[in-house]
A protein has these predicted regions:
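Small beta-barrel nucleic-acid-binding modules, primarily SNase/OB-fold domains
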Residues: 2-8, 14-153
Length: 153
């Protein structure tokens, strides 16, 4: 490893400490989990609110609840590793979390049950474009973006 890479690693590693490695995870909604007392909001994505609904072929369904359940299924008592990225305005820890080295944020966006939160990050835009092009998840429905839903409700 070059001296520069080594020094950068030493300098920046403390900024992104491993937040958690645990199987004791409570899923709050499609983009928020709880590990112990720590509320963790997935950074860079926005999932539908828990009470939010979508319409598919004139049938209304709970897409917010579906997003949450998809995350529950994905985690299924597996070890979750989270990397801290900061705090949000509500005091929640912002982090990217992984199961088997797969980003849960990327998974949710690629499945169409979360959106790239472009206001804060462009990291998951390609995942969103993939889901949209394949009409996955909410992209096959009539929906409001979560940020519009929150503003209107």
């Amino acid at each position: 490893m070059s001296l520069i890479k080594f020094l950068l690693t030493i300098v920046f590693l403390p900024l992104f400490p491993l937040l958690a490695e645990t199987t004791n995870v409570i899923v709050t909604d499609g983009d928020t989990i709880r590990i112990g007392e720590e509320r963790i909001r997935f950074s860079g994505i926005d999932a539908p609110e828990i009470n939010q609904t979508c319409t598919y072929q004139e049938l209304e369904f709970a897409c917010g609840e579906f997003s949450k359940n998809l995350l529950v299924e994905k985690i299924q008592n597996q070890q979750v590793n989270c990397v801290r990225e900061g705090k949000d305005q509500y005091g929640r820890t912002l982090a990217e979390c992984f199961v088997n080295q797969e980003s849960l944020s990327s998974f949710l966006v690629r499945e169409g049950y979360a959106f790239a939160y472009r206001k804060y990050s462009k990291k998951f835009v390609l995942d969103e474009e993939y889901a949209q092009n394949k009409s996955k998840g909410m992209w096959a429905t009539e929906f409001q973006y979560p940020w519009d839903y929150r503003r209107n409700n």
